[in-house]
Each structure stands twice: as C-alpha cells, then as structure tokens.
Design a protein with these regions (language model features):
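NAD(P)-dependent short-chain dehydrogenase/reductase
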Residues: 110-157, 163-164, 171
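Rossmann-fold cofactor-recognition segment
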Residues: 2-16
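Mid/C-terminal beta-alpha module of Rossmann-like enzyme folds, strongest
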Residues: 168, 175-218, 224, 259-263
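Catalytic helix-loop patch of NAD(P)-dependent Rossmann-fold dehydrogenases
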Residues: 52, 57, 80-121, 126-127, ...
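Substrate-binding strand-loop-helix patch
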Residues: 129-131, 155-164, 183-201, 250
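NAD(P)H-binding glycine-rich loop region in Rossmannoid oxidoreductase-like domains
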Residues: 13-53
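NAD(P)-cofactor binding segment of oxidoreductase domains
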Residues: 31, 45-73
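Amphipathic terminal alpha-helices
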Residues: 244-263
C-alpha cells in the first residue's frame, strides 16, 4: 500500500459494525471492494462464512456508499456461469452458478447493481508478479525446481494480466461509467495450455507439465468454459486487453528475473 495514503485495518467478519462509521468518516470518492474468499472449495463447505463475506457485508457496503453518494466497485467472477456455452460469455448471458462460491458472487452482483452508480467487474485467472497470483507462481516455482506438475485440460478461462484490470477500472471511473462489465484477457485457454505458455516464455521443460482432467479432484464444480468476452468494455473505454502472449510478455518485461518472493 502506498505510504502516502492513510490506512485503517478492519477484520470485516469481527468488526462488521464498524464498517459504516469508518467509510462515512473517510468519505471516499469511490470504494473498491476486493475482499473475498478466493478458495472455491472452501466456500462449498463453509456456506455461512461465504455468504457473510460475499453477500451480507457487500450489502452493508452498498448501503453506506449509497448514503454518502460514493460509487462502489465489486470484483466478480466467471463462476457465475455454468460453463455450457460453446463461445465466450457476455454480460447479457444468464447466470447459473455451479458452486456456492459462484452463487454468493452472483447474489452480491445483484445487490451492487441495484444502485445505478456502482460497477461490477467480472474477471478470471488474474496473473502478474504478485503473491496472490497463485497459479502462475505455482507453475513457475515447480518448473524452475524441475518438479512435475499436473494441469487441467477440461477447464478453460480467459487469463487476465493484472495491469489491464487496474487500467480498465481507472478508465471507467475517470469517464464516470457504471454497470456490469467483463474485464478479461482475449485468449481462451485451459490451465494446461496456460502452463505450457509459461514454460515456453520462461524457458522451462514443458515435459514436466502433465495433462489431467478435473473430474473428482475438486469438491466444488467449476464451469468447463469460463471464458469472458470483454468487447463491451474495450469499446467503451477504447482499450484492448492483452491476449495471453501479450500478457506474459508484459510480465517478463516488467521484471527480467523472477522475484524470489514468488518462488
């Protein structure tokens, strides 16, 4: 966090009653809610926790932001879809989540979008030099060590370089747009294909990557097709999101060696 900004730390689950007063006192121009349980399998077996964080607390944020006339930004997911579509999903497609995680995110979207000034950004498989870029870090760490990994061939997403998300969001805010938008990379590919791309670009042995399928390996169902069409966003802000080659190249150019913290 930039040290030029003030910080107030809250445990949203334990300090829920303080959310309204803290935000009201700050009176921000915009509130960006990035809080979530990212572990889909955890949410499948912890309904109360997932519902509290994703839905109930989102409702609290919507209420206080409405009171102080500050737009609220919410990050959502491809998991709101069932994955049966043969092409990329658009914002107009009907949601039908397979997992409890997806259900809570869909329910949160509905609460957010009840207020016209708010923004929902759906994205998927975010990657970059960041400790939370779990798939990318896991692949690169193991391949660098010469360890074999398995990667699914039956689940596809439009992996998204983090910088594209931040740029797109600032464009939306600066231009005073609101509503529901998909913000994801252009290339629809499986986790296996993504891992192969990473091996190619970083010079690691692709033979270490073993293709597998997700059946019976995850407690929560995922959409087989989680690919998002971001044309609406791109046209609105006049910006083209990266395909997978452009995204990985951008990642490499921003740091010529892999930072130790990610390995």
């Amino acid at each position: 966090v930039n040290s030029n900004f003030s910080q107030t730390k809250l445990n949203l689950l334990d300090d829920r009653n303080q959310i309204s007063s803290v935000i009201t006192d700050l009176n921000p121009d915009v509130v960006i809610n990035t809080v979530a349980y990212p572990n889909v399998d955890f949410c499948e077996t912890h309904h109360n926790e997932a519902n509290l964080l994703h839905v109930s607390i989102t409702g609290d944020l919507v209420s206080v932001c409405s009171d102080i006339s500050s737009p609220l930004v919410y990050f959502s997911t491809d998991a709101v879809f069932d994955g049966t579509k043969s092409i990329k999903y658009t914002e107009d497609d009907i949601t039908s989540p397979l997992s409890y995680y997806g259900k809570t995110k869909r329910d949160a979207e509905k609460i957010i979008l009840n207020i016209n000034e708010n923004i929902v950004l759906r994205t998927t498989v975010v990657y970059d030099w960041h400790i939370r870029s779990r798939f990318t870090n896991w692949v690169l760490k193991n391949l660098k060590q010469g360890s074999k990994i398995t990667a699914f061939t039956d689940q596809s997403n439009t992996a998204t370089i983090a910088g594209d998300i931040s740029h797109s969001l600032f464009c939306l805010l600066d231009q005073h747009h609101s509503g529901l938008f998909h913000c994801a990379g252009k290339t629809c590919l499986s986790r296996y294909d993504f891992a192969i791309k990473l091996a190619d670009y970083f010079g690691y042995d692709k033979k270490l990557i073993i293709p597998t399928i997700s059946k019976n390996t995850q407690s929560a169902s995922r959409p087989e097709n989680g690919c998002l069409d971001s044309s609406k966003l791109e046209e609105l802000i006049n910006f083209q999101l990266c395909n997978i080659d452009q995204g990985i190249t951008s990642m490499i150019n921003s740091s010529k060696t892999i930072p130790d913290i990610f390995l």
